[in-house]
Design a protein with these regions (language model features):
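Symmetry-related core transmembrane helices of the 12-TM Major Facilitator Superfamily/SLC fold
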Residues: 169-187
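Juxtamembrane intracellular "pre-TM" segments in multi-pass secondary transporters
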Residues: 1-5, 186-214
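Cytoplasmic helix-loop-helix junction between adjacent transmembrane helices
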Residues: 103-147
Length: 214
């Protein structure tokens, strides 16, 4: 198997596994904390940091990847999701709103690191040749087109796991599965993928036009 295809399959497999857990953790948190008697407003607050830190990560993720490589940002995102899932396996008495918001913040950072890394790496691994553009289009379509389907499957998976094995075992099981997936990805992905020869300064990620920045 050619190196580019092998790398693409590793990236896609890791991205799919992550997306499943991303959908599942949302459904598990909503249903579990609803069952615990949390109000709709409290449940909404559980996801506040997930969105806020995801937006921040989306803004600086490319700059980070240019310095350390897409392979490292993807692996970091995967293992950060493992930590977030593991953090939610603690004793129920620990699961305050602030605690869960912190865990979901880690998940939000992980999600955008993983998404950015997966999508950006595809262009780098497509073999050069006559049909390179066609193959790039197909590979990107497979990777990105699967997102909503897999996230929906993750919602179903989360509800099923909550019903069958409960909240803590569901979180622990997904953490273990994702750990194995990203451990393999860490071994399989080429080092330094996507690093830039010229390191941009942090301030260069902002536009010179003030109106765009604000």
């Amino acid at each position: 198997m050619e190196q580019g295809l092998r790398t693409y399959l590793v990236v896609t497999g890791a991205y799919w596994a992550f997306t499943l857990t991303d959908g599942a953790i949302h459904m598990l948190v909503v249903l579990h904390f609803h069952n615990l008697g949390f109000s709709p407003l409290e449940i909404a607050f559980l996801f506040l940091f997930y969105e806020v830190f995801g937006i921040i990560t989306n803004g600086v993720g490319g700059w980070i990847a240019s310095h350390i490589g897409l392979n490292r940002t993807m692996i970091t995102g995967g293992f950060l999701q493992v930590v977030a899932l593991g953090a939610l396996t603690v004793d129920p008495s620990w699961l305050s709103v602030a605690y869960v918001m912190t865990a979901m913040a880690m998940s939000g950072i992980a999600k955008d690191l993983n998404k950015m890394s997966a999508k950006s790496s595809v262009k780098l691994v497509v073999p050069k040749g006559e049909n390179a553009d066609t193959r790039l289009f197909k590979w990107v379509a497979i990777l990105t087109g699967s997102k909503n389907t897999l996230k929906g499957a993750g919602f179903f998976l989360g509800g099923l796991l909550l019903y069958v094995i409960g909240f803590r075992w569901a979180m622990g099981g997904m953490a273990a599965m994702l750990f194995v997936v990203y451990l393999y990805a860490w071994w399989a992905l080429p080092m330094g993928m996507g690093t830039s020869k010229t390191k941009a300064k942090f301030k260069q990620i902002f536009s010179k036009t003030r109106e765009i920045n604000i």
